Amino acid sequence: MKIRTGWYSEYEYYVVKPLHNKQRQVLIMFAESVGGGRWNVGAGVFSCNVTYHSLTLSKVWRTPTSTNKNPSIITVKLALEALQEIEQVIAQDSQGKRRYIYVDGLDERRQRVYTKLLTKKYNYKKSTTKCTYCDLPMLYKRLG
């Protein structure tokens, strides 16, 4: 599923996993189009701002955009690997039990779109449970 987000970044893919530690951080893996068939793929650890229900950047890293004849093919492949990797991390952490995650799209529209992505494409289910730290709605998936 492709998500339109604005002129500066044509499409983005996000998967979010909370790291419910003392720093209240979340791990985000993403892929974003920068136009011309070029994509940035990356991941970041963000601090959860309880007051404003938003994410504050604390660390982020990206792969350099490929410069060969088919940049989009290679970098989209990396994007898919990033999404698979986050699924594996969640699966290992859950040990076959339900794993809850939450989505923060920085604004209400993005939050709805990311929630739809996870429920439709990645088979997450909506839950009445909310995030311990920021009261965002949780999604869950039985893994393993």
What are the residue ranges of the model-derived segments?
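Non-catalytic substrate-recognition and accessory regions of acyl/acetyltransferase enzymes
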Residues: 1-144
